[in-house]
Amino acid sequence: MTVGVDEVGRGCLFGPVFAAAVSLTGAADAELTALGLTDSKALSAKRRADLVPHIQAKASAWALGQGSAREIDAHGIRVATELAMLRALQKLPIQPELVLVDGVLPLRLWPGAQRTIVRGDSQEASIAAASVLAKVARDGLMCRLAERFPEYGFERHAGYGTALHRQALITSGPTALHRKSFLTRLFPRDDGLR
């Protein structure tokens, strides 16, 4: 079984990094491609949401994983991203024979065969499917967390460092789910961040 993995939320200031792992047969690959499956960044939110049930129904296997803000702060974004990918892979019902990893960096924590593919989310349907599942899952979490932390507007920017988010950080300070290691680079100590 070949599995594609991808992550979302790597550059956010808030919340976990998400990853998904997806295995597709050749027929499922063709069907999803015909439905417009491509890199999640090239799709509208509605189109991504519409594709999710098709991906879940047609995939041989799929799973999600997360790397928490605490893990990002403790170990760095690369390790936390690898942990999210590893967790997704470990949730699959069958051990993959080959893992296709989006990007240039190999998954150091994975003991099996793997291949990195630059812009893999626009070249391999399994990676594109993983990018869509991870993006929709993370965006859903951000909308739920927006109800808990309404002053930050997470439903609008998903935790990325927009002007709205940076202003909310200055006004309200960070939450326990903010990535402190990212904030120290963005806000020098004398910048008024609580």
Curated annotation (Swiss-Prot):
Bound cofactor: record note: Manganese or magnesium. Binds 1 divalent metal ion per monomer in the absence of substrate. May bind a second metal ion after substrate binding.
Any GO BP annotation = mismatch repair
Which cysteines pair up through disulfides? They are none
The residues that the entry says bind a divalent metal cation are 6-7, 102
The record's CDD domains line, in alphabetical order, gives:
RNase_HII_bacteria_HII_like
Keywords of the record: Cytoplasm, Endonuclease, Hydrolase, Manganese, Metal-binding, Nuclease
**Which NCBIfam families does the entry mention?**
PRK00015.1-3, PRK13925.1
Role noted for this protein: Endonuclease that specifically degrades the RNA of RNA-DNA hybrids.
The record's section on PANTHER family has:
RIBONUCLEASE H2 SUBUNIT A, RIBONUCLEASE HII
- This protein is called Ribonuclease HII
**Lineage, broadest ranks:** Bacteria, Bacillati, Cyanobacteriota, Cyanophyceae, Synechococcales
